[in-house]
């Protein structure tokens, strides 16, 4: 985060921005805040009113917790809703949230959660255990077709209900014996369950509010709009102006409302990181979502106290569509694309050492020893790194998100593949929504992609490439891989479980439907008067814990 010394600020009445988004925001923001005096920046005026101004990179696709799939959507959703648990930002360990305690049976198959007695929806209605039961049944309903339903598959009969094998949702392994108790019965032991329960797909929804707008499994209904959304988190939805701003107001019904100093949060969907950095310098943001790598050195030299480079449990990789081109159906071709990549050079020259090169999909975490692709030297020595003889050589397309980093990484890969393999690769830049859609529909050959851990366990990365995973957009499927993860799921001894996960990762890297590139880092600018901004390896923060310095 940039250390600010004598950076120039635009006075409040004549805000200057570099895009129509920021111009629209500057005008709208003045209506949200209580006004600002001459020479006062939006950040200064916002601080006086307890308003936090945040860059958030992209317009939300959906604020339905059961349907959201992007980090930028879920950052907002996590402020609107709350599950049974929440993860500590720094340690990633589960903490009590809607539940104040829980216990597990000796066989690891039955978990009992005890809800707090002071839970309310934002409209004042009491929130009880039955709300969680109905919400999880909704998330698993095949009519909703929620991609994230798979996170609930640890529940007994969840897969059977989601697949239509059974029709009665009461057979799913969750019951509410009373208003403040939830009993979860699992298909297999899941020691990571308390962390898993912090994900948005496990959040409760106000059933009557959903049904007011039609069947609760209908998508795109207006219950997620301002004035209609009923939530249970620290904030409520006050304003949603598409492509301009989302404003959250403190929820007075939340159990910890009295302790939250941040009264209001304004999220700005500024997709261009250069525009976002300029907005920060102009005093329009308390914190950016990211920072162009080309600006890191400048901020390190001139304003290091405002520059934050924090570890992120995130993996960036090349996604290969094995069904998109005959050459890509060959594992030898995919391995050649991977081994032609000089990851050290990529990290040093393109990423300016802000990210670590990756030779595995899973970042280092806990007691897990990640698998690793072979070194380039070893692969070339045994000949497995050569491009299979294809006449003519394939001409491939690489799709990337149009941010400040992916195109630069793509250009480096393009040059490496041309030099090492003699193949031509074109680069197509896309805005985030289209970039995601083309991966989902298989409309790509090569793609730069990334995954941020949902919970602190290797499985959060490895389960992406199960044959039936809704996020396995590679066209690759392996019964052996599926079997290894299934064995790990039923293995209670920690070391043996991790060994099976490592074996699965080794198989994945050898088959190469993906090629690891580098591990993520959260690179931001944070205004000096924001207190309690701690590293968050999973990318989420409880904004209600932040404070404004005097």
Where do the protein language model's features map onto the residues?
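Extracellular/periplasmic solute-recognition and catalytic clefts
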Residues: 238-249, 266-324, 348
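Long beta-strand-rich cores associated with HINT superfamily self-processing modules
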Residues: 524-550
């Amino acid at each position: 985060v940039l250390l600010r010394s004598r950076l120039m600020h635009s006075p409040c009445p004549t805000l200057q921005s570099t895009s129509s988004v920021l111009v629209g925001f500057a005008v709208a923001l003045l209506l949200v805040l209580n006004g600002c005096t001459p020479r006062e920046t939006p950040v200064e005026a916002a601080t006086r009113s307890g308003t936090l101004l945040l860059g958030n990179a992209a317009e939300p696709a959906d604020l339905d917790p059961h349907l959201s799939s992007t980090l930028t959507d879920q950052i907002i959703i996590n402020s609107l809703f709350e599950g049974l648990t929440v993860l500590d930002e720094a340690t990633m360990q589960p903490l009590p949230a809607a539940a104040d305690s829980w216990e597990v049976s000796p066989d690891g198959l039955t978990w009992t959660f005890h809800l707090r007695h002071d839970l309310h929806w934002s409209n004042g209605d009491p929130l009880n255990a039955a709300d969680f039961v109905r919400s999880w049944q909704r998330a698993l309903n095949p009519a909703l077709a929620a991609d994230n339903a798979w996170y609930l598959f640890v529940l007994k009969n969840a897969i059977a209900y989601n697949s239509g094998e059974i029709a009665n949702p009461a057979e799913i392994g969750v019951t509410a014996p009373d208003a403040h108790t939830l009993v979860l019965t699992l298909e297999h032991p899941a020691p990571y369950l308390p962390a898993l329960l912090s994900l948005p797909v496990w959040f409760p929804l106000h059933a009557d509010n959903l049904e007011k707008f039609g069947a609760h499994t209908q998508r795109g209904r207006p219950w997620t709009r301002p004035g209609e959304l009923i939530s249970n988190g620290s904030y409520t939805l006050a304003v949603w102006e598409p492509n301009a701003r989302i404003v959250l107001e403190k929820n007075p019904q939340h159990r910890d409302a009295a302790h939250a100093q941040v009264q209001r949060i304004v999220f700005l969907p500024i997709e261009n990181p250069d525009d976002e950095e300029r907005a920060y310098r102009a005093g329009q943001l308390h914190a950016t979502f990211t920072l162009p790598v080309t600006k890191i050195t400048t901020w390190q030299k001139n304003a290091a106290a405002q520059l934050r480079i924090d570890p992120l449990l995130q993996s960036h990789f090349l996604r290969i569509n094995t069904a998109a081109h005959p050459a890509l159906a060959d594992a030898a071709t995919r391995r050649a694309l991977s081994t032609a990549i000089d990851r050290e050079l990529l990290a040093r020259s393109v990423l300016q050492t802000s990210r670590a090169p990756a030779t595995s999909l899973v970042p280092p975490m806990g007691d897990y020893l990640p698998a690793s692709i072979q070194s380039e030297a070893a692969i070339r020595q045994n000949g497995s790194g050569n491009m299979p003889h294809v006449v003519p050589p394939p001409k491939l397309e690489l799709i990337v998100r149009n941010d400040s980093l992916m195109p630069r990484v793509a250009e480096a890969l393009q040059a490496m593949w041309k030099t090492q393999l003699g193949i031509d690769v074109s680069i197509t830049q896309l805005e985030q929504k289209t970039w995601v859609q083309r991966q989902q529909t298989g409309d790509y050959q090569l793609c730069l992609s990334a995954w941020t851990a949902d919970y602190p366990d290797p499985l959060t990365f490895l389960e992406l490439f199960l044959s039936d995973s809704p996020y396995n957009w590679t066209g690759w499927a392996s019964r052996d891989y599926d079997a290894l993860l299934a064995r790990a799921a039923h293995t209670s001894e920690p070391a043996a479980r991790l060994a099976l996960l490592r074996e699965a990762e080794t198989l994945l890297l050898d088959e190469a439907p993906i090629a690891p590139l580098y591990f993520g880092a959260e690179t931001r600018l944070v205004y000096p008067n924001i207190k309690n901004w701690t590293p968050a390896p999973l990318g989420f923060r409880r904004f209600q814990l932040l404070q404004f310095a005097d």
